[in-house]
């Protein structure tokens, strides 16, 4: 009894007018978010048996205040400091105490006190009614975290498995869409495309499910005291890797933390918030080599969603676990969203630009497409990824995409029986594919722009309508291969073996085919303008209606080739061998035929206007008339048959006889 009297004597009184003024100023302070008004300070004030129904004392200083027997029903005491306050026999029906500091306070005998109103409070050394004091918070936390722990470890294990698969993924398996997990019995159950597009979606859904469970857990924890009577905290009753996420949001835990607690918080945050975005980033990075725009954009979207969750969820958790804080002054919604999502927007834009730059751009290596400078904008994305030591284009050097022939039968029949790989419409831009094996491969409409396939084996491969712009196919074996309607501008096929290949309707403008073997090839209506065919073997090839303007066919072998209706305007044919070739209605306007051998060639109706026949051997040519030679103006030093020479001199009125060569002895 003496203790109660002394406590009452220590408290100071306050008039009703002063109390009303304090409450009014405090209300303004709360409503303005602390920008105006005065925060109430009623420390040590005697308010015993006062009628304080519905008052708003949120965040007020009420240390050692005497509320014994007072009516505080429906009052707002959120976040108030009530250290050693006397609340005995007070009416606390509907009173909001969330976030209040009740350390050492006396609430014994208080009426209407409910544990659900004590969320985030500090109850250390407080005296509570028996019904409230017996509440077991440890059991509630253990039950709430059980399922969350299972999902947490499922995410970690899934990300670990995915990281291992990504680390062991080769470009060959990625291109072939082979099994992502090759040791499974059903080897085709999880193809690469399914794994790289399905696994990220699964991880994101699992990640979001986990954090929705955590939000429910944080909500349950927010309904519990932050500090119990014995000084324990809820985090001690749950696993550290989950509780550490909420530690910095609890008012009574974040003020004094040990280095170990800081390390736990950082590690827990990295694992819970950033393990999924980082894993999705590696999915995106590894999948770039497949050059699949749709799949890559899906990765960018999933990464953006995960980054948005990782950056926004801590703010949501803070609002859930700190209910005693003052409400912030309302702001325009767009700036708030922009501030919260700025990391997400920046990462999404960066990944999109890198993806577009890789799939539509070119490698950082200046030796590829040397006509483009090293600072060209199309190289920026590859140069950016090169800083982390990653080349975003496939490297399948010396790989075998098609199986070898059965029983080691390398005869023509055995090679023709090989079942080639199906890679129709595959994107292999700027891939490194030196000495690869593509026999009978299906590459319809494949994109091989800038690809390096030197010495590759493409026998019987189908590259119909393929894009081969600037590709390097020197010394390839491509007998019987199909290049119909392919876009092979500026391709390098020097020294290639294209015996019996079909290049009809192909665009080989500015291509390099020097020393290539095109014996018996079908090249109907091919576009070879400005192409280099130095010493190329075109014997028995079909080049009807071909476009060969300004092409170089010096020293080329054109024996028995069919150039009917071909356009050879301005073509360099010096030293070429036309023996027994067919050139019906061909256009040789301004062509250079110096030293060419046209013995036995069929030249009926061919146009030789402005052609240079100096040193050319036209003896035995079929269908060649004096009118054709007169049109050239450069026939005088050509080797002609005697009758053709006389007819030409008579028609052209030559002032100088044509060179007929040595007379054969009789």
Predicted features and spans:
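Membrane-interface segments at the starts/ends of alpha-helical transmembrane spans
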Residues: 139-145, 179-198, 257-263, 289-303, ...
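Hydrophobic alpha-helical membrane-embedded segments
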Residues: 158-162, 195-223
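Internal/C-terminal transmembrane anchor helices
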Residues: 329-363
């Amino acid at each position: 009894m003496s203790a109660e009297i002394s406590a009452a004597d220590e408290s100071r009184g306050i008039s009703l007018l002063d109390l009303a003024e304090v409450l009014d100023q405090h209300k303004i302070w709360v409503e303005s978010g602390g920008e105006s008004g005065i925060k109430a300070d009623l420390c040590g004030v005697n308010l015993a048996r006062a009628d304080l129904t519905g008052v708003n004392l949120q965040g007020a200083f009420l240390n050692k205040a005497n509320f014994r027997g007072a009516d505080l029903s429906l009052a707002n005491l959120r976040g108030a400091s009530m250290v050693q306050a006397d609340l005995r026999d007070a009416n606390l029906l509907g009173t909001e105490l969330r976030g209040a500091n009740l350390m050492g306070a006396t609430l014994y005998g208080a009426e209407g006190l409910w544990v659900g109103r004590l969320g985030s409070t500090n109850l250390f050394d407080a005296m509570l009614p028996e019904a409230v004091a017996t509440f077991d918070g440890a059991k509630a936390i253990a039950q709430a975290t059980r399922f969350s722990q299972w999902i947490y470890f499922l995410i970690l294990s899934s990300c670990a498995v995915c990281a291992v698969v990504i680390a062991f993924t080769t470009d060959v398996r990625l291109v072939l869409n082979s099994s992502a997990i090759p040791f499974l019995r059903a080897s085709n159950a999880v193809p690469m495309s399914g794994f790289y597009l399905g696994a990220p979606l699964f991880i994101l859904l699992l990640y979001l499910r986990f954090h929705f469970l955590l939000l429910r857990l944080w909500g349950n924890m927010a309904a519990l005291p932050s500090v119990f009577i014995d000084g324990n905290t809820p985090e001690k009753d749950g696993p550290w890797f989950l509780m550490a996420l909420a530690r910095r949001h609890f008012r009574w835990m974040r003020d004094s933390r040990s280095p170990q607690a800081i390390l736990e918080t950082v590690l827990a945050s990295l694992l819970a918030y950033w393990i999924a975005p980082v894993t999705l980033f590696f999915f995106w990075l590894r999948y770039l080599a497949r050059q699949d725009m749709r799949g890559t954009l899906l990765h960018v979207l999933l990464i953006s969603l995960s980054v948005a969750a990782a950056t926004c969820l801590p703010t949501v958790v803070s609002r859930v676990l700190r209910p005693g804080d003052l409400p912030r002054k309302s702001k325009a919604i767009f700036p708030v969203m922009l501030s919260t999502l700025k990391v997400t927007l920046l990462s999404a834009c960066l990944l999109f630009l890198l993806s577009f730059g890789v799939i539509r751009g070119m490698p950082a290596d200046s030796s590829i497409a040397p006509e483009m400078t090293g600072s060209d904008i199309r190289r920026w994305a590859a140069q950016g990824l090169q800083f982390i030591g990653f080349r975003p284009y496939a490297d399948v050097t010396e790989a075998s995409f098609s199986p070898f022939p059965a029983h080691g039968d390398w005869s023509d029949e055995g090679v023709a029986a090989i079942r080639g790989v199906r890679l129709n419409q595959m994107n292999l831009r700027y891939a490194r594919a030196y000495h690869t094996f593509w026999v009978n491969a299906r590459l319809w409409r494949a994109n091989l722009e800038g690809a390096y396939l030197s010495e590759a084996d493409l026998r019987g491969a189908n590259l119909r309508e393929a894009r081969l712009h600037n590709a390097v196919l020197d010394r390839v074996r491509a007998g019987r291969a199909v290049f119909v309607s392919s876009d092979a501008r500026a391709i390098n096929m020097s020294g290639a073996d294209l015996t019996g290949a079909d290049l009809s309707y192909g665009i080989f403008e500015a291509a390099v085919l020097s020393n290539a073997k095109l014996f018996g090839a079908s090249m109907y209506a091919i576009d070879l303008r400005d192409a280099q065919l130095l010493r190329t073997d075109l014997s028995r090839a079909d080049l009807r209606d071909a476009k060969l303007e300004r092409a170089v066919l010096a020293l080329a072998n054109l024996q028995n080739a069919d150039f009917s209706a071909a356009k050879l305007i301005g073509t360099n044919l010096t030293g070429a061998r036309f023996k027994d070739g067919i050139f019906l209605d061909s256009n040789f306007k301004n062509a250079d035929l110096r030293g060419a051998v046209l013995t036995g060639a069929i030249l009926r109706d061919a146009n030789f206007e402005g052609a240079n026949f100096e040193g050319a051997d036209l003896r035995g040519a079929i269908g060649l008339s004096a009118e054709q030679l007169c049109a050239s103006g450069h026939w005088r030093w050509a080797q002609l048959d005697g009758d053709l020479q006389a007819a030409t001199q008579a028609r052209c009125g030559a002032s100088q006889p044509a060179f007929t060569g040595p007379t054969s002895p009789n």
